[in-house]
Amino acid sequence: MIDKKNITIGIVAGEVSGDILGAGLIRALKIQYPQARFIGIAGKNMLAEGCKTLVDMEDIAVMGLVEVIKYLPRLLKIRRLVIDTMLAEKPDIFIGIDAPDFNLDIELKLKKQGIKTLHYVSPSVWAWRQKRIFKIAQATNLVLAFLPFEKAFYDRFNVPCRFVGHTMADIIDLQPDRQDACFQLNLEPKHRYVAILVGSREAEVQFLTPPFLQTAQLIKQRFPDVQFLVPLVNEKRRKQFEQIKAQIAPHLEVIFLDGQARQAMIVAEASLLASGTASLECMLCKSPMVVGYKMKPFTYFLAKRLVKTKYISLPNLLADDMLVPEMIQEDCTAEKLAEKLSVYLEQTESGIKNRQHLIQQFTQLHQLIRCDADKQAAQAVIDLLNDEV
């Protein structure tokens, strides 16, 4: 049994989402180990929980191949610092949160030196670059997965993995309060809304805004009382969206929101969105959705050959069924998107029944992944510390 008084935990988060996860994990661990010392790379949330950071987390929060190449010397220097510090400190366990390209090499070197390692948030090995699982097996004593199908994939390769549930499923109510979301957005609850979420990346906004706006125009013709909510992550993406809108749909009225995507999903009768984590959030908000995705033809050509899954959206992957329409590349047209979206907006008896049935399925999936992830993750760390994995 580990001495609770002298425990040291190495922990590295590489971006904001990881910092939030890390803070929740530290909080849960301190219930069992109030004297524990945490050291690694932390953002403001983990720092607030008492974690000591070796460098500013922003120094490793780099996205995109070009940016990674540009900052590679700095990233390698920081990784060396983390490894040297951990070998000197000899923590009882090292936890890498997400950021697999940064963390797995650290975990590999530390594990070889006899330090227990845990990787929190499975890389998408089940979807593409599946051979990475062999490196993960070498680098970690245990992987913590958000979703049950991820654990099933690790089980196939006999790699120790524990399903802990998804923190987002813990935060969002099983029955979200639409009235409250309307109040937060200063919207009239009796009106009908459709949320349009074009993604947070420049390329997503570039490729998805035209068909999504054209879809909105078709929906407006068919359902004149519908209003459109457009949450955008920052001013840069809003300007990009507005420039495209001025060319594609200058007269279409939309309600711009400063972020607030979650509230928009809760308010919306239906949502049109890019694939990714947004589709999971939309499911948890109980908003019927159509998923659309477009990219450069060559990128799509490569992706089609690399991606090994039947579906691209998380609700469909979770259900292992086509719960929500996925309109990809050539199918991501205004006519096809509007046709699928209209099904959710019909006020007929069958339309209302379809919506209710879909929301019921969303609720069942929500319950499946609502497991108090912080507590489950902390228990997994404790079990590994005590050789009970």
UniProtKB/Swiss-Prot annotation:
CDD domains membership: Glycosyltransferase_GTB-type
Keywords noted in UniProt: Glycosyltransferase, Lipid A biosynthesis, Lipid biosynthesis, Lipid metabolism, Transferase
Keyword rRNA-binding attributed: no
One GO location term (cellular component): membrane
GO molecular function annotations of the record: lipid-A-disaccharide synthase activity; phospholipid binding
One Pfam family per UniProt: LpxB
Pathway the protein contributes to: Bacterial outer membrane biogenesis; LPS lipid A biosynthesis
Keyword Transmembrane: no
Reactions listed under catalytic activity: a lipid X + a UDP-2-N,3-O-bis[(3R)-3-hydroxyacyl]-alpha-D-glucosamine = a lipid A disaccharide + UDP + H(+)
Main EC class the enzyme belongs to: transferase
Gene Ontology annotations of biological process type: lipid A biosynthetic process
EC number, UniProt record: 2.4.1.182
Family classification: Belongs to the LpxB family.
Chain's role: Condensation of UDP-2,3-diacylglucosamine and 2,3-diacylglucosamine-1-phosphate to form lipid A disaccharide, a precursor of lipid A, a phosphorylated glycolipid that anchors the lipopolysaccharide to the outer membrane of the cell.
Protein name in the entry: Lipid-A-disaccharide synthase
Organism for this UniProt entry: Histophilus somni (strain 2336) (Haemophilus somnus)
